[in-house]
From Swiss-Prot:
This is Arginine repressor. InterPro entries: Arg_repress (IPR001669), Arg_repress_C (IPR020899), Arg_repress_C_sf (IPR036251), Arg_repress_DNA-bd (IPR020900), WH-like_DNA-bd_sf (IPR036388), WH_DNA-bd_sf (IPR036390). One of its GO terms (molecular function) is DNA-binding transcription factor activity. The gene is argR. It holds the Pfam family Arg_repressor. It comes from the Bacteria.
């Protein structure tokens, strides 16, 4: 069942029919799959889907191969500019706000950047918690994030 559902997700992505997880849930239900948003979220992560600009200030899901793969700092810069809409901090914690559905991709890019001051990220749908160690490095990390997001 999972393999069939994930094949259908890939078909829907290739057809450009889904822009949000809610769209995905509805499209899958129309195709006879009984799914929840949590199931779709896990499938998106397992399939490695990404959100890319789709025009008119909207984003859409795509396969990683639909966009040239960019590594390191340049990838982080692009992901931040495309997805991040706000930053805040408290002590050694930084909150990164993204467009809906953008948090997983941004959190992954942060993790892959390998900054030694960042010991981990937790990404939801539109919010990421970044844990910084040592605490005194949080200000510098926040400043780098602001620069990456164009702020």
């Amino acid at each position: 069942m999972k393999a069939r559902r994930q094949r259908k997700i890939l078909e829907l992505i290739k057809a450009g029919l889904v822009k949000t997880q809610e769209d995905m849930v509805n499209a899958l239900k129309e195709c006879g799959f009984n799914v929840t948003q949590a199931t779709v979220s896990r499938d998106i992560k397992e399939l490695g889907l990404i959100k890319i600009p789709g025009g008119n200030n909207a984003f859409r899901y795509a396969l990683p191969g639909d966009r040239p793969f960019i590594r390191g700092e340049e990838r982080l810069r692009r992901v931040f500019r495309d997805s991040v809409i706000g930053l805040d901090s408290s002590e050694n914690l930084i909150i990164v706000k993204t467009h809906p559905g953008g948090a997983q991709g941004v959190a992954s890019a942060i993790d892959q950047a390998g900054w030694r001051e960042i010991i981990g990220t937790v990404g939801g749908d539109d919010t990421i918690l970044v844990v910084v160690k040592p605490k005194r490095a949080a200000g510098a990390v926040l400043k780098r994030f602001e620069e990456l997001s164009g702020g």
